[in-house]
Amino acid sequence: MRKSHYDASIDYLITIKYSFKGESIMTEMQQYVEDVLAIIQRRDPEQTEFQNAAREVLTSLVPMLEKEPKYKQHHILERIIEPERVIIFRVPWEDDNGVFHVNRGYRVQANSAIGPYKGGLRFHKSVNLSILKFLAFEQIFKNALTGLPIGGGKGGSDFDPKGKSDREVMHFCQSFMTELCRHIGPNIDVPAGDIGVGAREIGFLYGQYKRIQDAFDAGVLTGKGIDYGGSFARTEATGYGLLYFVKDMLDNKNIDIKGKTVIVSGSGNVAIYAIEKAQALGAKVVTCSDSSGYIYDANGIDVATVKDIKEVRRGRIKEYIETHPDAEYHENSRDMWKIPAFIALPCATQGEIDLESAKILVQNGVKAIGEGANMPSTLDAMAYFQEHGVLFAPAKAANAGGVAVSALEMAQNSERLSWPFEKVDATLKDIMRNIFEESRDNAAKYGVPDNYVAGANITAFMKVADVMIEQGLV
């Protein structure tokens, strides 16, 4: 089989090969990784998203595995790729016209070695088991990077809240939680929001949980409203954390973020607050987008207008030009990557930057990428950025701010206290700096300096794997 651009790049970037009689042979640990990836392919051949996520993580671990054979001896890779539990259930609900519908609900409880399962709920028509296994697998490592005691999980449904009334969304959320409540708890599994699950949905979900359990267990969900156990800075956390990581990455190379042009995709929480923090740090953000198209504003995006469109009116991004006639609206969001910039922040969805887009970004002068969405760059694109010296902040490290503040929300719920915004934000900044420094240092330690993909994966894997060894074969 012909190797993909990504596979060839991985060979070049992070693996060690030896030549014997003119042929290239794999090291023991390379073969170990390939054998484990073959297990996934054999068991779940249709789960391409999960396969890609596993390949991205496991291949990047090879330099560390060469020096730390204990992980192979304890069969950690075989164990960590298999979720501890996968729950699938039906979700019946009734729309405003009295018509009955049935959607499918999921919860993937991936790993609880260092704490209760933690990860968001996604409501979107594209949701399937492969996507949720990929997200749950990523969540294991993202959560471990925070240094907080939280395991990895993910859930959701193929229900799409778009176009539904508040009443219909409430009916669905109540039905969804009626089953999910059997499998979660403050010390078991703590879901949060994700695509399609915002403050409204979290409120409906928590209300139904409280009704069924007859208890005010605020710590069972995060992303709640401030008045019933939520945390200040939770809404801003992922976007702010992304910029804290990117700034540290640039500072490490003596590059000042001030005055740099930034292109941002998306217009949800991550994108909005990434724009807000980038502007606060002195950068100039010129784009944002939604599923209908993108805005280019050469004067700099007016984040207050975007907030009004998306958070208040729940409108489309093209409405921006109604109050900013000098801005441009274009329907093909992929063309956004053609705009010259120094920094690109993909904050929309997975796979939005492919190899072709990566080439365009590099050609147009982008020197740093910060992933705000979950795995928005394809494997080919990631390899291309690495090959061309682009500073690349991978999602599991760069967007860990959201789950970090979710864990801080859990801590506040346990204390029955509410921390001020400034304390939460300062703690978030410290957590993101620690993630950056550990990723940087481990990348250098294991022979792949400036490769934050490998550095983050190695750091997170070792945190989880060491505990799995201590806890035995469970």
Tell where the protein language model's regions lie, with residue ranges.
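Short, Lys/Arg-enriched N-terminal segments with co-localized hydrophobic residues
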Residues: 3-25
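Adenosine-phosphate binding glycine-rich loop
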Residues: 27-53, 249, 362-474
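Glycine/serine-rich phosphate-binding loop and adjoining beta1-alpha1 elements at the start
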Residues: 124, 143-258
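Glycine-rich phosphate/diphosphate-binding loop of Rossmann-like nucleotide-binding domains
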Residues: 230-338
